[in-house]
Amino acid sequence: MVAITAALVKELRERTAAGMMECKKALVEANGDIELAIDNMRKSGQAKAAKKAGRIAAEGIILAKVSADGKFGVILELNCETDFVAKDAGFKAFGEEVINAALADKITDIDVLKAKFEEQRANLVAKIGENINIRRVAALEGDVLGTYLHGARIGVMVAATGADEELVKHIAMHIAASKPEYVKPEDVPAEVVAREHQIQLDIAIESGKPREIAEKMVEGRMRKFTGEVSLTGQNFVMDPSKTVGDLLKENNADVVNFIRFEVGEGIEKVETDFAAEVAAMSKQS
């Protein structure tokens, strides 16, 4: 039997918005498997939707640049500990230097990039007094590349064909706002589709629907699901009367790939219990 820790219950609560006792019960029934617990809670109606693991917590900036010929682009995340340092001129200048090198030398291996700038990073840490991390880097190549930065916290890069600069920029802005996970509905992995199909089928059957009717209901729900998680299936944020796919078709354009970075995705800050910290310090003194 897996121990059901407070941290596990807390994570499930954050991802489902369900009550503490419901989360603990679901984890016990799932033997500590949080993904299974979420699936079971969705089937029973306790959780209509589950958030992805990892709160947006770390600070830093996203940078994105495209080569002069417009065929190669790099997007980068540089982390620090506080919002104050994220706005620091020295921190930003370091980020510019790193992304310029990644672009010029086509460095897409994060370990290679980190090694190249380790000495400068260490010097900046000593100067600023905060830990700094070149967290991730990614690149795209294509006929038409476009980028969009929402402040410095969200960055998007899009590779397209048959599109002009303005269209690619609008698509990138849509991606920043709507967070698609795939380019087209058919790109959604079979295992993701199968898992969602089973959840929706169980929900329909448990609501009292005969299996045959439940299957037909789920077909419609699955079309909606794959559309919602894919770029071309989503309603375009600037004109919800059409999908992004419709917009691309109107312009004889296509999106080959995209990358969306948001500062701190998947990183959770350690929360300090101030009262416990004071109590611990008083015991030491």
Swiss-Prot record:
> Domain of life of the organism in this record?
Bacteria
Q: Does the entry feature the keyword Cytoplasm, yes or no?
A: yes
Q: Under the GO molecular function aspect, what terms does this record hold?
A: translation elongation factor activity
Q: Which Gene3D superfamilies match?
A: 1.10.286.20, DNA helicase RuvA subunit, C-terminal domain, Elongation factor Ts, dimerisation domain
User: Which cellular components does GO assign to this protein?
Assistant: cytoplasm
User: Which InterPro entries does this one have?
Assistant: EF-Ts_dimer_sf, Transl_elong_EFTs/EF1B, Transl_elong_EFTs/EF1B_dimer, Transl_elong_Ts_CS, UBA-like_sf
Q: Where in the cell is it found?
A: Cytoplasm
Region annotated Involved in Mg(2+) ion dislocation from EF-Tu, chain positions: 82-85
Q: Which SUPFAM superfamilies match?
A: Elongation factor Ts (EF-Ts), dimerisation domain, UBA-like
Q: Which NCBIfam families match?
A: tsf (TIGR00116)
Q: State the family named in the UniProt similarity comment for this chain.
A: Belongs to the EF-Ts family.
For this entry, the protein name equals: Elongation factor Ts
